[in-house]
Amino acid sequence: KLVMDFEEEKSSPSLPYAVEKYSELLKSDALLIFDGPQHESDLPTLNFGNRGISSITLKTYGPIVPQHSGHFGNYAPNPVFRMSNILSSMKEENGIVKIKGYYDGIQITDEVMQYLDDVPDNEKIMRDKMQFKIPESVGSTYQESLQFPSLNVRGIKAGWVGSEARTIIPSELSCLILRTST
């Protein structure tokens, strides 16, 4: 049996219905998931476990309707600055999550660290391909960092940008945060 999920990056909206509808047909003894990028060495890899996901939408509010910043700037609260303060309180500059208990239960044994260290990652090549210099410091290596839950801002929506830009204080900001965990 083979199930292909082409909506995985948008939370698989059709999958629950398909699983319920075809539950008898999908019964099996095991589940094997093929996910993740091909390793840069082109060598085959095998991962034990996948990251799960949970998400939350945060909202901050300013005036009940958008206001002209020339008339109400420095008076009407801007929800963008409120959210930026909230978000910056969640992570250190080096990427480590500051939320109490966020990493509770994560233990990497010496044996597991040895396995992780044996993966032939060339992190300089990886960073060059993605065009950034300094990685976050949650783990000492790429492989170690994958063993910890991540905190990601998936999207922010507020105000106007591009050809619609205005000198307006927006009335609200919506931010979708997700946590992936092992």
Predicted features along the sequence, with ranges:
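Short, proline-enriched alpha-helix->beta-strand connector loops that line the catalytic pocket
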Residues: L26-K27, S171-L173
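Short, solvent-exposed beta-strand/turn "edge" segments of beta-rich domains on protein surfaces
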Residues: Y75-A76, S163-S171
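Short beta-strand elements
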Residues: S55-T60, G155, R166-I168, R179
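Short strand-loop junctions, especially beta-strand C-caps/beta-turns
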Residues: D5-E7, I156, T180
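Fold-level recognition of mixed alpha/beta catalytic cores in primary-metabolism enzymes, strongest
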Residues: K1-I134, S140-P149
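Short, glycine-/Ser/Thr-/acidic-enriched flexible segments
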Residues: P37-H39, P63-V65, A158-V161, T180-T182
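A structural supersecondary motif
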Residues: T141-T167
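Short, hydrophobic beta-strand segments
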Residues: L173-T180
